[in-house]
Each structure stands twice: as structure tokens, then as C-alpha cells.
């Protein structure tokens, strides 16, 4: 009986506070017993694995069900959300350019990133994304190819739009059932994050990051400017309301989880649950959240721009204003295609370095630096990317609701 009451109290507890407790205990365990801390990393891996496993099914079922059950003349607000995604990514690249010029970083380059193959150009990235669009639906689910999943989900939803009410009800019930499983997995987040924090501190530590403190400061500074200045400004522009309650809630409930899972895909169920909590339009967020995990890449744009300009300053190359603006555009476009590249934003750095005539050997050494600081860079990048998906979706939904009142 006491066991049941403990479980009930845990289930009713504040999830964010429970996650913070998990973080503290993870750091303590890594400090006291690194060997045991590495062992509990298994819990973190299981948590991330569970999120990654449920996310493709969740997206496919939700998208198909929401489109199939959409009423006539019912509008979704995808166009303004996509515009905000693209604007946010470009502004992120621009912020990184400004900070990189104000506080130029000089790197000590020694070795390259072995076994990594960067894309040859924008055309290759677009080609990869197009082929992901027409992927086999079963393979798309197995490989967690969200572009393919979205395409097939939308296609099936449109096909089912004229199906019988019973068939539509089955898909609606399926979406509710999958959502229940997601809520159960999210309740286990404190244990998962405890394992992730403990193993990260035990295996990596932060001594390796000390020599790259300046580079990290520029990277994280640009990300904070986007998260705390630019994103709130965009939300205020759309809603004409104080943006900070929404921004802080999204950073707290989406950003913290994304920071430790380091996976936009794994954070899709968390974002879906947050959108439901914010009472947003399900037909909109069921599409905008998985799409955002694919193309809304403000953090990736910052990483590409900052590390490319670090290489530029290290090589002593002069950069004029127009080239810097061109870099912002290239970084923004490349970042939107980061999901189409194995290794994500870091392997798009050679593409941006090509603008300045920097050799592939030097560019791959910069990529190696990116891998060294990845424990912080990748975590912060994912937290910014993922929380921004909800922020922009909420801003547009609330703006459209105000217009309709």
C-alpha cells in the first residue's frame, strides 16, 4: 500500500523539480564514484532509446489522424510557423557572425576528425532531403526519417479524409493511445536524466573543455541572445503580449530535457505533450513540431557560423560585410538541411569553410574541435532548437486565436 502511495506521489509531483533532483544526484554520483556513474548511464540510454522508439510512431499516427479528422474549412497555421522557423534560423546565424567579429576566436589546430565525410555542397544536401521525402514508409519509421514520416502521414491523412467515420475514429483512438504511452515515458525523465548526467560527468568531465572556454563562450553567448532576446522579440511581434512566461516555460519544460537527451527527435514527444498542456491547436502542432525538429535549426546555424569564423580568424583571412552576410545565408540554409547529414551541423562546417577557400584538411580539424566541445555544444544546440519549435508554434497559434476572437 505504501509502495502504491509513493508511486502516486511521484506521478503527481512537479516534473521539472524531479528532473533538477535527478541532475543534482547525477553530478554527486559522478563526483563520488565515477565507475558506478558510468554504469547508471544505462538508465539514461534506455530513456533516450524509449523516446526515440515512440517518436516516429507518434508523429505518423498523430499527423495521419489530425488530417483525416480535420473538419472542412478548418485551417492550420503552418505557413507563418515555417516563416518563423526560417527567420529564426537566419537571425541565429547573423547573431553568431556579430559575436564572432566582436570576440574573434583563434584555434589551435592539430588533428582532423577521422572517418567523417562532409557533404560536397548544398546540392548534395538538397538531394539527400528529396530522397528522404520519397523513402519507403516502413523504412522511414525504422530509420526515424521524419521528412519521410511527415510526407506519408500527410498522404495517408488526406486519403483517409473521405473514409468512414469508424475508420477515422480508429486513428483518433490510436493517437490517444500512443499519447498515453508518451506521457508514461516522459514521467520517467528524472531517472533517465539522472543516468545521462552521471555518465556524462564520469566519462567526459569538463577538463577537456577548459582550453576551448573562449569558443564555448561565443557559442553559448549567441545561443543565449537568440533564446532570451531574439525569440522573445519574435513572439512579442506575433502576439503583442509579454513573451517571457511562454519562453521560460518552453526552456524549462522542453529545453532542459533536450539538453540532456541531445536529440531533437527524442524530444518530439516532450514537445507534443507541452503543446497539449499549452492548449494549442492539435492539427497545427502535430505537423509543426516534427517539421521543426527537421528544419528549425537556430542552434545548428550558430555552430556552423561560429566555428567557420573561428577557422577564418585562425587562418588570418579578411572578411568583408557582404561575405559575412552570405555566410549567414549559407549557414541558415545548411542548418535547415542538417537533418539530412550524418553528424549534423558539425559536418556542414567544411561546406561553409569553402566560402573562404579554406582547405578540407583545415576544415576537418575544426570539425574535430567541434566534437571535443560537443558535450556542451550539442546539448545547448539541441535545447535551443527544440524549445524554439514550441515557442514559434505557440506564438502563431495564439496570434491566430486573437485574430479570430
Swiss-Prot record:
Involved in the import of serine and threonine into the cell, with the concomitant import of sodium (symport system). The chain crosses the membrane at residues 15-35, 43-63, 81-101, 140-160, 188-208, 217-237, 289-309, 315-335, 362-382. One of its GO terms (cellular component) is plasma membrane. Coiled coil: none annotated. Gene3D superfamilies: Sodium:dicarboxylate symporter. It catalyses: L-serine(in) + Na(+)(in) = L-serine(out) + Na(+)(out); L-threonine(in) + Na(+)(in) = L-threonine(out) + Na(+)(out). The keyword Transferase does not apply. GO terms for molecular function: neutral L-amino acid:sodium symporter activity. This is Serine/threonine transporter SstT. It is found in: Cell inner membrane. Belongs to the dicarboxylate/amino acid:cation symporter (DAACS) (TC 2.A.23) family.
